[in-house]
């Protein structure tokens, strides 16, 4: 296999993989919006529990955001520090 063709295939597959990884950012965004909306509803129903509701919401959003950050890191690695290009020689 021609080395230029192999490198092109690896870079194209990396771009597709990075795009697919960034699709994973949709889930945390939708989940965080839903959680924030439900927290607002909960505070409206029970204002005296505002502190507990907000702290639980922030903790849940931090956990949800971690998956989006991981997908961003994977996409950046695939695009700018691709370990597979070095294996070609």
From Swiss-Prot:
Q: What else is known?
A: The ATPase of I.tartaricus is of special interest because it uses sodium ions instead of protons as the physiological coupling ion.
Kinase among keywords: no
Membrane topology field: Multi-pass membrane protein
Please give the subunit comment from the record: F-type ATPases have 2 components, F(1) - the catalytic core - and F(0) - the membrane sodium channel. F(1) has five subunits: alpha(3), beta(3), gamma(1), delta(1), epsilon(1). F(0) has three main subunits: a(1), b(2) and c(11). The alpha and beta chains form an alternating ring which encloses part of the gamma chain. F(1) is attached to F(0) by a central stalk formed by the gamma and epsilon chains, while a peripheral stalk is formed by the delta and b chains.
Q: What is the recorded function of this protein according to its Swiss-Prot or TrEMBL entry? A: F(1)F(0) ATP synthase produces ATP from ADP in the presence of a proton or sodium gradient. F-type ATPases consist of two structural domains, F(1) containing the extramembraneous catalytic core and F(0) containing the membrane sodium channel, linked together by a central stalk and a peripheral stalk. During catalysis, ATP synthesis in the catalytic domain of F(1) is coupled via a rotary mechanism of the central stalk subunits to sodium translocation. Key component of the F(0) channel; it plays a direct role in translocation across the membrane. A homomeric c-ring of 11 subunits forms the central stalk rotor element with the F(1) delta and epsilon subunits.
- Site Reversibly binds sodium during transport — annotated at 65
Q: Which family does it belong to?
A: Belongs to the ATPase C chain family.
Q: Which residues lie on this side of the membrane: Cytoplasmic?
A: 30-67
Q: Periplasmic compartment: which residues? A: 1-8, 89
Q: Where would you say this protein principally sits, based on its record?
A: membrane
- CDD domains under this entry? ATP-synt_Fo_c_NaATPase
Please name the HAMAP family in this protein's record: ATP_synth_c_bact
The molecule here is called: ATP synthase subunit c, sodium ion specific
Q: Which Gene3D superfamilies match?
A: lithium bound rotor ring of v- atpase (1.20.120.610)
Q: Which cysteines are disulphide-bonded?
A: none
Compartment(s):
Cell inner membrane
Could you tell me the gene encoding this protein? atpE
Q: Which GO terms describe its molecular function?
A: lipid binding; proton-transporting ATP synthase activity, rotational mechanism
**Keyword Ion transport appears in the UniProt entry:** yes
Species assigned in the record: Ilyobacter tartaricus
Which sequence ranges are marked TM in the entry? 9-29, 68-88
What the entry lists under InterPro entries is as follows:
ATP_synth_csu_bac/chlpt, ATP_synth_F0_csu, ATP_synth_F0_csu_DDCD_BS, ATPase_proteolipid_c-like_dom, F/V-ATP_Csub_sf
What biological process terms from GO does the record include?
sodium ion transport
Keyword terms: ATP synthesis, Cell inner membrane, Cell membrane, CF(0), Hydrogen ion transport, Ion transport, Lipid-binding, Membrane, Sodium, Sodium transport, Transmembrane, Transmembrane helix, Transport
The entry's cellular-component GO terms read:
plasma membrane; proton-transporting ATP synthase complex; proton-transporting two-sector ATPase complex, proton-transporting domain
